[in-house]
């Protein structure tokens, strides 16, 4: 299609349509993935009509065998190319994917090269011409070894990234320059399992965490510290409903106690909901505000102690609320902003920072004293 003759309005409409199509087909893909995962899970459930533990075990074991097989074969291939003995170039693997380290190959073929575009071009080319056929050949060999009726194992290159950071199993960040052939002029973050992708993290914090990760991946520690401190300053001025943790409430009846409001070991969001309901009742606000109900979506914040919301001791440090905080609560004076900042923002950051040795604020050291 020749886009040069299209008007601006038509180009904008085409762009919007393309964005909608991308979202639509991505959702279709995710639906199929979830359906397949559900089917596998159901096979191992004794209440499913087609329950069969042997089938469930076969699915699990064939997946483990396939990914371990190809990881070992790619290590053999890389060691053969580089003459590196038995070095492990597979830095991570998951159910259906592996992450391969190409640093040594780049240094051998393109010594001293720092242009990311040239490096990505080379990796894209060599994967298509050499690694994809090699992987397919190895799966054919595995199929023959296992005497399969037909080999259905296929792998394709997903992303090319210059940096990766793992905080735990299935929790990682990649600085992506190419994703399935789509090239980015500035790297795009692929974030899996980190709090920026979780609905249980306040929306404004998710946004700022993502920007912090971008700085970690592409800038320096001083820039990062300055950004964190600037956000902390703005965070302290935000209203409670913007910085509160989103949750769903389950178990209100189970954890209710008529004398102490809630029982021991009550989950924090439920505890906050019971305290909220208690105050709606004792402050006689029931005609103006509904109490929180079972299964309802709420938010909760940490409170300073003592405060007027809990029992007689005033030591309860949390309160939940639905979409609207009753103005009669006058809650702003009691929200523990420092603790809320720590729990929503600093704690997720620190799970990343402990792996790279960075700090969230500048600290005086013996070296800095003499500098």
Give the ranges of each region predicted by the language model:
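DNA-dependent DNA polymerase catalytic subunits
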Residues: 1-33, 52, 60-95, 103-371
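Function-dense linear segments that define catalytic or interfacial modules
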Residues: 35, 39-42
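Short, conserved non-catalytic motifs in the polymerase core
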Residues: 46-58
């Amino acid at each position: 299609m020749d886009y040069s003759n299209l008007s601006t309005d038509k180009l904008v409409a085409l762009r919007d349509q393309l964005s909608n199509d991308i979202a639509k087909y991505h959702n279709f893909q995710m639906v199929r993935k979830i359906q397949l995962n559900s089917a596998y899970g159901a096979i191992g459930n004794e209440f499913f009509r087609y329950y069969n533990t042997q089938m469930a075990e076969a699915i699990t074991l064939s997946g483990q065998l396939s990914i371990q097989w190809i990881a070992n074969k790619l290590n053999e291939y890389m060691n053969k190319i580089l003459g590196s003995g038995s070095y492990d170039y597979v830095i991570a693997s998951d159910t259906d994917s592996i992450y391969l380290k190409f640093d040594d190959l780049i240094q051998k073929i393109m010594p001293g090269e720092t242009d990311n575009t040239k490096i990505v071009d080379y990796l894209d080319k060599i994967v298509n011409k050499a690694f994809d056929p090699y992987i397919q050949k190895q799966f054919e060999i595995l199929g023959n070894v296992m005497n399969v009726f037909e080999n259905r194992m296929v792998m394709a290159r997903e992303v090319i990234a210059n940096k990766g950071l793992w905080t735990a199993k299935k929790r990682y960040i990649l600085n992506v320059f190419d994703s399935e052939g789509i090239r980015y002029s500035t790297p795009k973050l692929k974030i899996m399992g980190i709090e920026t992708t979780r609905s249980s993290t306040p929306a404004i914090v998710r946004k700022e965490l993502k920007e912090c990760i971008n700085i970690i991946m592409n800038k320096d520690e001083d820039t990062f510290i300055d950004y964190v401190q600037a956000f902390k300053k703005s965070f302290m001025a935000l209203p409670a409903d913007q910085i509160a943790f989103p949750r769903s409430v389950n178990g209100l009846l189970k954890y209710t106690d008529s004398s102490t409001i809630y029982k021991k070991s009550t989950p924090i969001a439920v505890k906050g909901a019971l305290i909220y309901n208690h105050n709606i009742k004792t402050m006689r606000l029931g005609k103006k505000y509904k109490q929180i109900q079972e299964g309802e979506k709420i938010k909760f914040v940490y409170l300073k102690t003592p405060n007027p919301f809990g029992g007689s001791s005033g030591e309860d440090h949390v309160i939940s609320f639905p979409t609207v905080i009753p103005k009669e609560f006058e809650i702003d004076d009691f929200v523990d902003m420092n603790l809320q900042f720590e729990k929503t923002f600093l704690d997720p950051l620190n799970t990343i920072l402990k792996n790279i040795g960075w700090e969230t604020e500048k600290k005086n050291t013996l070296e800095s004293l003499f500098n």
